[in-house]
């Protein structure tokens, strides 16, 4: 960039009171309206935070060192930044904003740091876990749209821990995926598989995020759950999970992921399911009916929610590519 050819506003004599407007002014050279808007709001809130808390140099440097340590511990199988976002409630907030749900559809929740891309496609009824110590569980689910129609050929990514509360990627000797798979819904929207009953477990707390939780007086535990991710053209991407009722951490999830509509009971197969799926009548059973939202429904709801929320803040915006930017017309 040649400074002589760019209209850069003069920035001198910067103070506590005028630094924010000057940073925003020079960032306004950005041609990307969305990026410019995001940075304008970020700088505003970041500077207001520093002014409101009277942030000290030592605290500022402590924060920078903390973020450096978060980055250092990240790897292909451990994403500490996702953990940080999770324990601050940002992950669930962003999901709720970007993937709004109409009534009676399945709510989303956090992805977590242990999803992988090497899960293998399995046929209906296959077992996703090879843990002999886990309590066997039959899982039978349906996928429908918001009008009650079955949705076939949905790609469903599923993952859970073993009976000790560890995901496969947490083992140094991992030689392939376990406790995870990819299923596809049939023409009736049904998919079913054999798993083990989920157990509660702590998120990794041997790193900087764990140290932060300890300083805050918070525990690192997540309630018993099983992850699901749904993908099909024409439908909004759904990341969700099912949580077991009466788990000791049901109301204090370290990453704020539990929603009432996602809390389920483990029952028994009984005569009907036992005969149909080849298990004993007292075999543990989990059933759930997932409801996907179309891209069109999601786009309309997201735009409406954005306009309403920002109107309340007195901000005039327009929707561009599904996201709000200032409306200067």
Curated annotation (Swiss-Prot):
Binding site for Fe cation: 167, 201, 225, 227
Induction info: Expression is slightly induced in the presence of caffeic acid, p-hydroxybenzoic acid and protocatechuic acid.
Keyword Cell division: no
GO BP annotations listed: catabolic process; catechol-containing compound metabolic process
Cofactor(s) annotated in UniProt: Fe(3+)
InterPro entries per record: 1_2-HQD/HQD (IPR039390), Catechol_dOase_N (IPR007535), Intradiol_dOase_C (IPR000627), Intradiol_dOase_core (IPR015889), Intradiol_RC_Dioxygenase (IPR050770)
Primary enzyme class: oxidoreductase
SUPFAM superfamilies: Aromatic compound dioxygenase
Keywords from the UniProt entry: Aromatic hydrocarbons catabolism, Dioxygenase, Iron, Metal-binding, Oxidoreductase
Entry's EC annotation: 1.13.11.1, 1.13.11.37
UniProt entry tagged with the keyword Disulfide bond: no
CDD domains, sorted: 1_2-HQD (cd03461)
Subunit structure, interactors included: Homodimer.
Homology family: Belongs to the intradiol ring-cleavage dioxygenase family.
Annotated protein name in UniProt: Intradiol ring-cleavage dioxygenase hqdA
Organism: Aspergillus niger (strain ATCC MYA-4892 / CBS 513.88 / FGSC A1513)
